[in-house]
Amino acid sequence: MRTVHLAARRGYALVEVLVAATVLAIGLLGGVALLLDGARAARGARHATAAAGLLSDLGERIRANPAAGDAYAIAANRSPEPPADRCESTCDAASIAAVDLADWRQHAEAVLPGARTAVAVATPDGGTARQYRITVEWTVAGRDQRARLDAVVVP
């Protein structure tokens, strides 16, 4: 029969436990990193979806008020002042556009971090049909970058 010296085997169990704990810790850190990356991607997708909804919303408002013409044109981060009564009484097309833009801009600031908005009006080829280029920008969370989404609306 073979005799095993206990003195030679001492400490091996502790080393095995330390190696297993290290492997487990590395695995847990990798899992946490994946969760954080997934949450960041979900937040980015949520912001892109909100921006697409904002573009669609203003596009529908422009289509619903074709008489407003250039009243929907706004420089970056500017909104015209809406009428004091917010069109609760009768309003012309330009006043309705001012209310639409003020509401839309307020909503953009509520759903997108660092929101910037702009609407440019053009008549390509010297024609009479107007095109509205709607732009929404926002700050990407956790980065010093901005995301941007544009749409062209032809009423």
Question: Which role does the model predict for each range below?
Answer:
Residues 19, 40-49, 53-155:
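Flexible, low-complexity segments enriched in proline/glycine/serine and punctuated by aromatic residues
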Residues 1-4, 114-116:
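Short coil-to-helix leader/linker segments, especially the first N-terminal amphipathic alpha-helix
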